[in-house]
Design a protein with these regions (language model features):
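Charge-dense, helix-prone N-terminal extensions
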Residues: 1-119
Length: 119
């Protein structure tokens, strides 16, 4: 996969872990698409994206961004996601593997899939 050839090892590890969590949690009708060297996950519409800082146009200077396309529609009861300047896409930036809260991500993925099934 070309993505892994262009990003440094610390980003590669974070991307790998996030992709594994996502692919294990998404239902069979959801797919992954690599575009611009970035993994996009979608069902009926976009669900989430994993964007390493090394890849241009991601809007972050370091780390790996996990963004939810319809983050504004998620309850996010734990306030895990950053709202930023985008009104729709809410995200979390990971600079280290230890920052990844698997339970929080799974909870958000379940919410996102539930929303996607209503579209």
């Amino acid at each position: 996969m070309q993505l892994y050839e262009v990003i440094p090892e610390h980003e590669r590890i974070i991307v790998d872990i996030l992709r594994q969590i996502i692919t294990e949690q998404l239902p069979a009708y959801c797919k992954e698409k690599i575009s611009y060297n970035v993994p996009f996950f979608y069902g009926h519409k976009g669900i989430c994206i994993v964007w390493p800082a090394t890849i241009p146009r991601g809007g972050i200077k370091k780390g790996v961004l996990l963004g939810f396309w319809y983050g504004n529609k998620l309850a996010d009861a734990d306030n895990y996601l950053v709202h930023g300047t985008n009104k729709q896409i809410f995200y979390k930036i990971f600079n280290d593997v230890e920052e990844i809260n698997v339970k929080a991500i799974i909870k958000l993925l379940k919410e996102a899939v539930k929303f996607d099934s209503t579209i």
